[in-house]
UniProtKB/Swiss-Prot annotation:
One of its GO terms (molecular function) is cholesterol transfer activity. Cholesterol transporter that mediates non-vesicular transport of cholesterol from the plasma membrane (PM) to the endoplasmic reticulum (ER). Contains unique domains for binding cholesterol and the PM, thereby serving as a molecular bridge for the transfer of cholesterol from the PM to the ER. Plays a crucial role in cholesterol homeostasis and has the unique ability to localize to the PM based on the level of membrane cholesterol. It comes from Mus musculus (Mouse). Residues 565-575 have a biased composition (Basic and acidic residues). Residues 1-62, 256-336, 561-600 are annotated as: Disordered. Residues 8-18 have a biased composition (Low complexity). It comes from the Eukaryota. It is found in: Endoplasmic reticulum membrane; Cell membrane; Cytoplasmic vesicle, Autophagosome. One of its GO terms (cellular component) is plasma membrane. This is Protein Aster-A. Highly expressed in the brain.
Length: 722
């Protein structure tokens, strides 16, 4: 709940990410009236107990009793919720209270739950700041506090608990060794400690923008900041949640030269330049491989060894010459930029380019680092392809109906500039998950870039936020549509996607998110590619052209749907900050459960293994049918014989005279006597066998019986009377 009193003590700065997140879902920005406050004024963030005690006595007198009770209940809910899920500000205050001897300039960057191994395991939390590593544990009032300056660290090593579980980190100084275990995200913590340690050895300090960028990547966009936090600096990129208008004021696509952008995209980041000098002096010792953990991907981004055990020692000789970071938006992330995505930018050297415009756009805005889903050439103009995909066209309406999207609302493109436009879409997607909701609302934001007003090609970045699905506040997906005009009636469509995280989930949750999200993304864009191909075919048929000849000459090249490797190219952030604000509907977690709306053609893309399995299943079905027929035949034969026997008995003649009955009785007596004689023989044989067994048991008993000891045979003297 939000308190709208103008003198609240919990007012966040104008650049706070919580304000930007609330303004994200509003309609397109309009010029504010003269009565609205300036951008530098404070905006209310939440209600607090102090907000009702300072300068609001006049306002409280006009409020109703029910309103005040509602606010009081909301405060109670916030109190216990803050205890269970403390904000970054609360964690930072706890950090300063626990480690009061540290310099006041030290600010918490991230904290992890872990345990210190001594005589017993001391469960606590590990706190990381720019220059210190701190640990605090409190077990039944037994407090343990450790503070290690990063410059004093001599060795940083990954370890295994009990030589089996890869969840430990060992930090060594000249005098002590500290063994921390029970990490939930060991590799990510090791990577951040290593980068902070590397920065301390190089005597590099973080700028406020770089520090807050790291804080946002570790704790998300909601930090719980107030107006008292004057040192807050909003980074340029908040994992794609920044305002496109605000980022567009920093960088305009039309002002970037193709050559400069291409050179800038290939220039290594400050982290890469320093790592290139530090890594040759590092001694690495890997014990045994541990490639099963999900966090090992983050370890590979740093160019380190991918094994589960890794030792890093500091540089023996000082590094005197260091290149200064380049100026510009790409250097604002600084040497400790932990990108929200785990992959690097896609290398666009393999993409074919027929015109200079395609090369310019590819150099300015390369593919996203996730997966390339569509890379096709269509025999239609770039303008027409853009109208089909990004306007209220019959093609888009039919496609959304096939995907069973409802409550579709398309806002018009903002007309500020033809080179930089933006619009917001809202709709509802179906979900076939039986345990979850049946539908989910989606808010999609699309940002369009052009090289010029008359340019045929364009780039559209989209981002989507799906509400009402599991872990909706942890991630979102980004998509980039690149439409390149190759000729008058020929254009290329490239669509790349990636999953971006606002918070860092557990490895199990992360794998679940990626599995379900990529399944929905691939299904959506494969469907879109097929529908575009159908529309192209209809267009060619209406034009009276030879469809077969033209379609056979179409050059279609699709890349395999695989993750980009970390070492395919230089490690550098996206040159355009607006690319962090892209998203699409199919990338949500619920898209995996959406009903498929279009059936594929017969024999389209059927692998050989599926054909073999189908043949085996057909053979098994035939064998089962044959076995069923045999069993049915045997049962029918048995019933036939039984009916014949009963029929024969029914047609037989019964005895009529006394002589015939006497013969039957004599036969019966004879049969009875034979049976009695047989049973007597069986009983006699049984008795004989029992006698033999009894005799054998008696002999066995005599053989194992121990003889009694001999009695004393000496004669006893007789008592005689004299």
């Amino acid at each position: 709940m939000f308190d709208t009193t103008p003198h609240s003590g919990r007012s966040s700065p104008s650049s706070s990410p919580s304000l930007r997140k609330r303004l994200q879902l509003l309609p397109p920005i309009r010029p504010p009236p003269a009565s609205e406050p300036e951008p530098g004024t404070m905006v209310e963030k939440g209600s607090d107990s102090s907000s009702e005690k300072s300068g609001v006595s006049g306002t409280l007198s006009t409020q109703s009793l029910g309103s005040r009770n509602f606010i009081r209940n909301s405060k109670k809910m916030q109190s216990w919720y803050s205890m269970l899920c403390p904000t970054y500000k609360q964690r930072n205050e706890d950090f300063r209270k626990l480690f009061s001897k540290l310099p006041e300039a030290e600010r918490l960057i991230v904290d992890y739950s872990c345990a210190l191994q001594r005589e017993i395991l001391l469960q606590g939390r590990l706190y990381l700041s720019e220059n210190w590593i701190c640990f605090y544990s409190n077990i039944f009032r037994w407090e343990t506090t450790i503070s290690i300056q990063l410059k004093e660290v001599t060795c940083l090593k990954k370890e295994k608990t009990a030589k089996l579980i890869p969840n430990a980190i060992q930090i060594c100084t000249e005098s002590e060794k500290h063994f921390f275990t029970s990490f939930g995200a060991r590799d990510r913590c090791f990577l951040l400690i290593f980068r902070l340690w590397q920065n301390a050895l190089l005597e590099k300090t973080l700028s406020p923008r770089e520090l807050w960028h790291l804080v946002h990547q570790c704790y998300g966009s909601e930090l719980g900041l107030t107006s008292e936090d004057e040192d807050y600096v909003c980074p340029l990129q908040l994992n794609g949640l920044g305002s496109p208008k605000e980022v567009g004021d920093v960088i305009a696509l039309s002002d970037i030269s193709p050559s400069g952008a291409a050179d800038h995209s290939q220039e290594p980041s400050p982290v890469g330049s320093r790592r290139g000098r530090v890594t040759p002096n590092l001694s690495r010792a890997s014990s045994d491989a541990d490639h099963g953990a999900e966090e090992d991907k983050e370890e590979q981004t740093d160019g380190l060894d991918a094994s589960s055990s890794q030792t890093v020692t500091p540089v023996a000789e000082p590094l005197s010459s260091e290149p200064t970071p380049p100026d510009g938006p790409t250097s604002s992330l600084g040497p400790l930029d932990l990108l929200s995505r785990e992959e690097l930018l896609t290398d666009t050297s393999n993409s074919s380019s027929s015109t200079g415009e395609e090369g310019d756009l590819a150099a300015l805005l390369p593919d996203l680092s996730g997966r390339l889903l569509i890379n096709s050439v269509f025999h239609m103009g770039a303008e027409r392809l853009q109208q089909m995909l990004f306007s209220d066209s019959p093609f888009l309406q039919g496609f959304l109906q096939q995907r069973k999207f409802t409550d579709v609302t398309l806002s018009p493109w903002s007309s500020d500039s033809k080179c930089h436009q933006r619009r917001v879409l809202t709709y509802t997607i179906p979900i076939s998950n039986q345990l979850g909701p049946k539908s989910a609302s989606v808010v999609e934001t699309q940002t369009l870039f052009r090289r010029g007003p008359q340019a045929g090609g364009c780039v559209v970045d989209s981002e989507v936020l799906t509400q009402g699905i599991p872990y909706q506040d942890y991630f979102y997906t980004a998509h980039r549509y690149c439409i390149l005009g190759l000729a008058r009636n020929k254009a290329r469509l490239r669509v790349s996607s990636e999953i971006r995280y606002r918070k860092q989930p557990w490895s199990l949750v992360k794998s679940l998110i990626e599995k379900n999200s990529w399944s929905g993304i691939e299904d959506y864009f494969h469907h879109l590619d097929r529908e575009l191909a159908k529309a192209e075919k209809l267009s060619l048929e209406e034009g009276g052209k030879d469809t077969r000849g033209l379609l056979s000459g179409l050059r279609r090249r699709k890349r395999p749907l695989s993750w980009r490797g970390h070492r395919d190219g230089p490690q550098h952030p996206d040159p355009d900050p607006c690319t962090q604000t892209s998203m699409h509907t199919s990338g949500s977690l619920s898209s995996r459960f959406s009903e498929p709306s279009v059936d594929q053609g017969p024999g389209a893309g059927i692998p050989s293994a599926l054909v073999l399995i189908s043949i085996v299943l057909i053979v098994l079905i035939a064998l089962n049918a044959l076995l069923f027929y045999r069993l049915w035949s045997l049962e029918r034969t048995a019933h036939t014989f039984e009916s014949w026997h009963s029929l024969a008995l029914a047609k037989g003649k019964f005895p009529q005279t006394a002589t015939e009955w006497a013969e039957i009785l004599a036969l019966q007596k004879h049969f009875h006597s034979v049976e009695v004689h047989k049973w007597r023989q069986i009983l006699r044989a049984s008795v004989e066998l029992l006698d033999e067994m009894k005799f054998s048991l008696e002999k066995l008993h005599q053989g194992i019986t121990v003889p009694d000891p001999p009695l004393d045979t000496q004669p006893q003297p007789d008592d005689s009377f004299p």
